[in-house]
Each structure stands twice: as C-alpha cells, then as structure tokens.
Amino acid sequence: MYNAEGIMMNSVDEFKITIHGKGTHGAYPHQEIDPINIGVHIHLALQELVAREANPQDICTLTIGQFNAGSAANIIPESAILQGTLRTNNISTRENLLNRMKEVCHKIAETYRGTVEIEMVSTVPPLMCDLKLTLEMAEYMSQVGIEGLKGIPNSTATEDFAIIAEKIPITYMLLTVGFMDERSDYPLHHPKVQFDENVCVIGAACFVYCAIHWLENHKNRV
C-alpha cells in the first residue's frame, strides 16, 4: 500500500481551444487566414509557458492531446481545434498559467489575423489526504498484516475523488498488483496491460476492515 501526506495527486484543467481563420484553396494562401498555422504557434507558446513561467520546483505539465483541422490536402480550413490538459500541484502556479494561457492564445491569434475561443471543459482540484485519517487507516491495516504505508512522491496523475476531498477529510491509497506476465512493460491505461487481479482480494479486505472499524470507533459521528 502506498500513500502520500498532503497533496498526493495534481489538479487538472482540461481545455479546448477553437481557432477561427478564413478558408480557401491551397493555391491561394495569401487570401486566407490559416488556423493551422495559428494552432502550431499556440502549441509551441504553451510549452514555453511551462518552461519559462512555472516555478521549476513545482510539478507542472501541459499536454496538447488533440489537434484537429481540415478535411482535404489542398484546402486551408476555416478552423482548427486544440484540446489538452494542464496539471500542477501549486494553486498559484495553476491560476497564473491559466490566465497567461488565455492571454497568449488571444495575442497569437490576433498576430496572424485570426480569432480564438477558449473553453474550460473540466476542472479537478489537487487530491489532498487528511493526515489524521490516513494514520488511523494505517493502524487498522496493520491489524490485518499490512505494516505501514510506503510513501510516494507527488504524482502528475489526477483523481476526481479530489472533489469529494474538498468537502470532507479523506485518505487515498494505492494498491500495487503487478502483472500477469512479469515481462510485461505496458503502462497503465494501455489496452494490452494485464494486472494480477488476485491481489485485489487484499485491497477489498483492507477496505472492508477499515470501514467496519472506523464505523465502530466513530458511532457518534454516524
């Protein structure tokens, strides 16, 4: 079992950038406003924001996972869409980069005579573990043979359970299960990854044991 005090996983902001240009035939580029060109410059500028405006001591990563534009090889399209995520473990860094991202996108689009719309698709805060509750759960798990929790560094992954953690104290733990084939090197979420699900019995037992004993010891709060 693994756990981290304080921030365990990063926040994530998913965004969608729609670039509007002016489409035309590829033979007449001087008559158009190329949204693909604008999108390329925006993509590069966003990477530079992280490299030059985020504190190197903070965990921060910005990923563009989609870049969609056009329908034919010889046509400059009317629009282009970039979609991506910003992940960080620092609230101040997050707010600053989101503001700067919007500013940079609009300025670049204006430079190349286009316009841009930025939509925040979803937001998940950092996952914060409550130390007191975590230590209590660790004590319960020691009673079923799991001695102590191994610490892990803050992860760039995110977890929407963090939304609940903003309302009530929570703890969050990771159960390592290994692979069915020890030679496997497929990462999490890969379609070919196969975990050793036999280990899930241990996780289920810990979950039930902790829940029962917490309820027994906190009857006045239920």
Q: Where are the regions that the model predicts?
A:
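Histidine/acidic-residue-rich, glycine-tolerant segments that coordinate divalent metal ions
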Residues: 1-77, 156-159
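Active-site-adjacent substrate-binding region
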Residues: 44-51, 119, 123-177
